[in-house]
A protein has these predicted regions:
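Sec-dependent signal peptide cleavage junction
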Residues: 16-47, 313-322
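Residues on the lipid-exposed face of transmembrane beta-strands in outer-membrane beta-barrel proteins
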Residues: 46, 50-52, 72-80, 114-120, ...
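Transmembrane beta-strands of outer-membrane beta-barrel pores
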Residues: 50-56, 82-84, 93-99, 134-140, ...
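Extracellular loop and loop/strand-boundary signature of outer-membrane beta-barrel proteins
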Residues: 58-64, 99-104, 149-155, 202-207, ...
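Residues that define the transmembrane beta-barrel architecture of outer-membrane proteins
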Residues: 66-72, 108-112, 159-163, 209-215, ...
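Repeated loop/turn-to-beta-strand initiation elements of outer-membrane beta-barrel proteins
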Residues: 85-87, 125-128, 176-179, 228-231, ...
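Outer-membrane pore/translocation modules
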Residues: 106-214, 291
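Outer-membrane beta-barrel "beta-signal"
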Residues: 296-322
Length: 322
């Protein structure tokens, strides 16, 4: 069942991002030209958003709890092109808090991710590439009892820290879609704090360190599908060679649909799906933890708030490589 889920996800992703109607063939050729004609030098930019949500209730017969939440997101990039060489860098920051009724303020979102990839063009659409990626969070995360009191810390900065990298080939047919494939990929899970490691929540199997060697495929799609509506999707599939078929493939799939209202106001829908055989999720019954189980993880965020986009190009003239 899990294998079927992964296959269906890949097929649906490819269908959406790679299908080109007959009437769009001329546009696709223009996109390819834009990709190859990008000037040498740096291209810097990013987006920042701040989303605020508030629910107020007074004498509300249907019930519910008043709440306030705040979410900040920063996504920045720095790309450098020099002849056939392409170096891409990404920084992702996300932090959110919420306050429900009389409870103390709690964190409900936390992400710090750094990505760097180097590629050398071996043909018009293929790059020999290597990348490294680091993911962690910025502040401690706690579990709470029914009264809202902290019970135990389950994560903090660099606990866990997930570092993965690979050497492979990158297929880039146009400026919207890319597919990276590698039979030589590594994944390291670091949980330096013994008290957090022993909880076995982050895939390190109760240890401070775990190393995996396998294969990886990363599919990326980003495009303005209609005016002021942008879609971005990144699907990451990793297979540990030591795992048998029953353990299947690790899946990390992030999707964002953004709607730009004006220069400073925007709306967005974000979804994040994870399947990891080694991550055990606590199970509760009547507020009491009864054990752990492997579960499909899913998170979604819908928000309207302030947003700002910036971009800067620093062109550099270089002689063409033969």
């Amino acid at each position: 069942m899990k294998k079927l889920l992964s296959v269906l996800m890949v097929l649906s992703f490819l269908h959406v991002s790679a299908q080109v109607p007959a009437g769009e063939q001329a546009k696709t050729k223009d996109d390819e030209k834009k990709l190859t004609d990008n000037p040498n030098g740096w291209k810097l930019g990013g987006t920042g958003s701040l989303t605020f949500n508030q629910v107020g209730l007074k004498n509300w017969a249907a019930g519910g709890d008043p709440s306030i939440s705040l979410l900040g997101v920063i996504n920045a990039y720095a790309d450098y092109k020099f002849g056939k060489h392409l170096w891409q860098n990404r920084l992702g920051l996300e932090y959110g808090t919420q306050k429900i009724k009389d409870q103390a303020i709690r964190k409900n979102s936390d992400r710090l991710e750094i990505f760097s990839k180097y590629g050398y063009a071996v043909s018009k659409k293929w790059y020999a590439s290597a990348y490294i990626n680091m993911r962690t969070l910025m502040s401690p995360t706690f579990e709470y009892d029914d009264d809202g009191n902290k019970t135990q810390m389950i994560s903090k900065f660099a606990n866990p820290m997930i570092i993965d990298g690979a050497i492979g080939m990158d297929y880039v047919p146009n400026q919207y879609f890319s597919m990276f494939m590698s039979p030589v990929a590594t994944k390291m899970i670091i949980v330096a704090d013994d008290k957090i490691a022993i909880l076995d929540r982050h895939g390190a199997l109760g240890n401070n360190f775990r190393f995996e060697l396998g294969a990886v495929a990363i599919l990326s799609y980003k495009q303005e599908i209609v005016k002021n509506v942008n879609v971005q999707s990144v699907l990451r599939l990793f297979k540990d060679y030591k795992k048998g078929p029953a353990q299947n493939i690790d899946v990390d799939w992030q999707n964002t649909i953004g709607l730009k209202v004006n220069k400073f106001l925007s709306a967005a829908v974000f979804t994040h799906l994870i399947w990891d055989y080694d991550q055990l999720i606590p199970q509760f019954e009547n507020g009491i933890e009864t054990g752990v189980a492997r579960k499909l993880q899913f998170r979604n965020v819908i928000g309207v708030g302030l947003a700002y986009t910036m971009e800067k190009k620093i062109e550099k003239v270089v002689p063409e490589e033969k």
